[in-house]
Amino acid sequence: MAFQGTSRTLTQQSSAASSGDLQKILFSPDAIKKMATECDLGRHHWMRADNAISVRPLVPQVTSNNLLSFFKSGYDAGELRSKGYMSVPQVLCAVTRTVSTDAEGSLKIYLADLGDKELSPIDGQCVTLHNHELPALISFQPTYDCPMELVGNRHRCFAVVVERHGYIGYGGTTASVCSNWQAQFSSKNNNYTHAAAGKTLVLPYNRLAEHSKPSAVARLLKSQLNNVSSSRYLLPNVALNQNAAGHESEILNESPPFAIGSPSASRNNSFRSQVVNGL
């Protein structure tokens, strides 16, 4: 089915065979593996002294080659309206420190276009995080779609750039950066409203809280009372109200920390602080 100029999805604009080819390019086992090994999608990237500047493209080189060929052949055949664009609505980075808070150092994180030799931050979206501020969540929103093209011998696409500064005397890993995004590819492009880079400082997970509260005592007391045969000693399925421990109600209903991005975490964001635990 040839392209007819309507605003339809890419798979509708191309033939069924071409759609299958595109799916294979993006979601084959090899393509998924390359996204992990070359781009660190969803993986922890360690910032070390011998890796002070990290440039991670959002699309692997092999995938870029295949996408470029796919769109070019469709464009030359008159089936697609362009040679292809890459669209990334948002890039989210979770950053945690791996040294003590008194270590003097910082991270500079930004989104760049590999078509720019200087690798300047896109629209000034750049965040600097000092070691004592971590953990934190960072978000970037590109204001345009990136053409799938070659610039010299470089494949043009967006990239996450992380620069490590300071940390004198710390040769090992001082911070971990875990980036997530969802790249989209289409034969049409757009421009988007400019938004400043987001920076959210996150409360560290208090793993000592469960050991500092007498919740175990309250649970034991409730269990013993509920096992008494007389109904007048049966407790309803509610938290105990103890004068000796006024915060037991909160303790008994306390849930373990949720992982970032889980459905349970999103439902509970309205009443509990979000934490970064083990990113």
Curated annotation (Swiss-Prot):
Record key words, sorted: Host cell junction, Transport, Viral movement protein
Signal peptide start-end: none
Primary localisation category: host cell
Any Gene Ontology CC annotation: host cell plasmodesma
InterPro entries on file: MPV
Any Pfam family the entry gives: 3A
Coiled coil: none
Location of this chain's protein in the cell: Host cell junction, Host plasmodesma
One Gene Ontology biological process: transport of virus in host, cell to cell
Family membership: Belongs to the cucumovirus movement protein family.
Function: Transports viral genome to neighboring plant cells directly through plasmosdesmata, without any budding. The movement protein allows efficient cell to cell propagation, by bypassing the host cell wall barrier. Acts by forming a tubular structure at the host plasmodesmata, enlarging it enough to allow free passage of virion capsids.
Protein name (database record): Movement protein
